[in-house]
Amino acid sequence: MRKALLISLILPILIGGLVAAAQAPQDTPQGFMGINIGAGLAVGLAAIGAGVAVGTAAAAGIGVLTEKREMFGTVLIFVAIGEGIAVYGIIFAVLMLFAGI
């Protein structure tokens, strides 16, 4: 079951990158080096990682908040750290597409 879920999450990202790479002219950096596929993988895998991190941190945070309401700020910081993973993936993808890394 988990293999099917993982494949169903990754397959649309790969297909989208392949379609974008096929439409780009071959003389541009995006079409020649497959940067579109790399950018799609960067965003997709970072979003999956952020989802896992936020889900785990939020579940633990709810448990903490039921016992100690004053820990809200700390829980919010831990959940925000998990969201940072997705932001880094988006930044890296933009750098790949426009700076030609």
Swiss-Prot record:
Family designation: Belongs to the V-ATPase proteolipid subunit family.
Keywords assigned by UniProt, alphabetized: ATP-binding, Cell membrane, Hydrogen ion transport, Hydrolase, Ion transport, Lipid-binding, Membrane, Nucleotide-binding, Transmembrane, Transmembrane helix, Transport
Compartments where located: Cell membrane
Subunit relationships: Has multiple subunits with at least A(3), B(3), C, D, E, F, H, I and proteolipid K(x).
GO-annotated cellular components: plasma membrane; proton-transporting V-type ATPase, V0 domain
Function: Component of the A-type ATP synthase that produces ATP from ADP in the presence of a proton gradient across the membrane.
Protein name: A-type ATP synthase subunit K
The keyword NAD is annotated on this UniProt entry: no
InterPro entries recorded: ATPase_proteolipid_c-like_dom (IPR002379), ATPase_proteolipid_csu (IPR000245), F/V-ATP_Csub_sf (IPR035921)
Cross-referenced NCBIfam families: PRK06251.1 (NF004888)
Keyword Nucleus attributed: no
Pfam families: ATP-synt_C
Protein topology in the membrane: Multi-pass membrane protein
Segments traversing the membrane: 4-24, 32-52, 75-95
An annotated Gene Ontology molecular function: ATP binding
